[in-house]
Structures are given as structure tokens and as C-alpha cells.
A protein has these predicted regions:
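Residues that cap or initiate secondary-structure elements
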Residues: 15-17, 42, 72, 94
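Beta-strand cores of modular interaction/reader domains in eukaryotic scaffold and signaling proteins
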Residues: 10, 35-37, 87-89
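Arginine/glycine-rich "motif VI" loop of SF2 helicases in the C-terminal RecA-like domain
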Residues: 29, 56-61
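Conserved helicase motor "Helicase C" RecA-like lobe of SF1/SF2 P-loop NTPases
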Residues: 41-58
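C-terminal edge-of-domain segments
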Residues: 63-98
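Histone-fold modules and their flanking histone-like tails across chromatin and transcription assemblies
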Residues: 1-27
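Short, surface-exposed connector motifs at secondary-structure boundaries
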Residues: 29-35
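Short amphipathic alpha-helical molecular recognition features
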Residues: 11-15, 38-41, 45
Length: 98
């Protein structure tokens, strides 16, 4: 069974190229799908990462699924707030003969 967070790249506040390299590394290690996850302000970076991967690095990758949701998170002071999240699933065609 595959661990839950395997083949997942969490996007935060780093430069997009850092996440692009992480996604490309996952594909290079033999994964057929990679999920890019982000919340809040990092959503636009996640979208950029997916497009950079598809257009420049893994040209045969395609969007398998995109999910947008609202999550409730608890802040430092115990207050609950709602944050938008996105999960972008990129996939490559299965290797021939597999």
C-alpha cells in the first residue's frame, strides 16, 4: 500500500522552481502521478508550478484531476478560519509494456 503523502508536493512560500524540481524528481523516480497541494496565497504558485512542469519539463504530463475546496483551520489563538485549498493531480501515460 502506498503511504498517503507519497507522490505529493506541498506548495508554500518558496520560489516556484523549487516545487517544479520536486515534481520533476517524483516523475523521474517512476511515479505515474504527482499531486500538487496548496492553500491560500500559495494556490497561484501551485498553478504556475503545474503549468511549468507540463510546458517545459514533462511534456507528456496532463491534468488528471483538479479539486478546489474550503478547509477550516484553527489559528494560533484558537480561532477557526476558512482557507481555500487546491489539489492538482498531474499524470504521465503508463510506460509501454507495463
Amino acid at each position: 500500500m502506498v503511504p498517503m503523502d507519497e507522490h505529493v508536493v506541498y506548495v508554500g512560500s518558496k520560489e516556484p522552481i523549487q516545487y517544479v524540481l520536486a515534481v520533476v524528481t517524483e516523475f523521474s523516480s517512476g511515479s505515474d502521478t504527482v499531486t500538487i497541494k496548496a492553500r491560500g496565497r500559495a494556490i497561484s504558485i501551485a498553478c504556475d508550478v503545474a503549468e511549468i512542469v507540463r510546458s517545459r519539463h514533462v511534456k507528456d504530463a496532463s491534468y488528471r484531476d483538479v479539486k478546489i475546496a474550503t478547509e477550516t483551520v484553527q489559528g494560533d489563538r484558537g480561532r477557526h478560519s476558512k482557507v481555500t485549498s487546491i489539489h492538482i493531480v498531474l499524470g504521465k501515460p503508463a510506460a509501454a509494456g507495463a
